[in-house]
Amino acid sequence: MDNVNLTDNFLIAMPTLEDPYFSNALVYICEHNENGALGIIVNRPIDMNLASLLEKIDIKLEAENLADMPVYFGGPVQLDRGFVLHRPIGQWQSTLAINSDVGLTSSRDVLSSVGSAGLPAEILVTLGYAGWDAGQLEEELAQNSWLTVPAKASILFDLPPEERLPAAMQKLGISFTQLSDVAGHA
């Protein structure tokens, strides 16, 4: 498991993962290195839409058609902080390039441009993120807490939240009902 970089991969929570934050979660890994990992849960909309989030932080929504866009629970770390997954990457103040097309931005300027010509074509807005210390994710993988699969931007941006986990699992050729909470080792 050493030297495995899961940046731009999905983590699929196994049934054995009893942490309520991650039960049935699909996590998009935005950064993974020797210092740890950062991911965003992408299938958990919360009871808030983009219009109400922007209103709370005094940003005018330029595009009314985006008002009902859901905001997501991104993970249990820094729940008061917003993160925006977006495509294309663009030129924002604080953007982490995940791949050549998808970025994660935590600066306010990306939200200020919602609905303007400078807005990224596709966005997913979250509050909070999932974080792992150095070696923690690798340990959880060794304990069979997660399945991994290369991510597809179309799953992030083109599917409704309830279809994202099944679509990621389909990439592995399995469905959630086929997963067991009993780990086996050959």
Curated annotation (Swiss-Prot):
Disulphide bond pairs: none
Superkingdom of the organism of origin: Bacteria
Gene Ontology cellular-component terms listed: cytosol
Family that this chain belongs to: Belongs to the UPF0301 (AlgH) family.
Protein name per UniProt: UPF0301 protein Daro_3893
Organism: Dechloromonas aromatica (strain RCB)
Taxonomic lineage of the native organism: Bacteria, Pseudomonadati, Pseudomonadota, Betaproteobacteria, Rhodocyclales
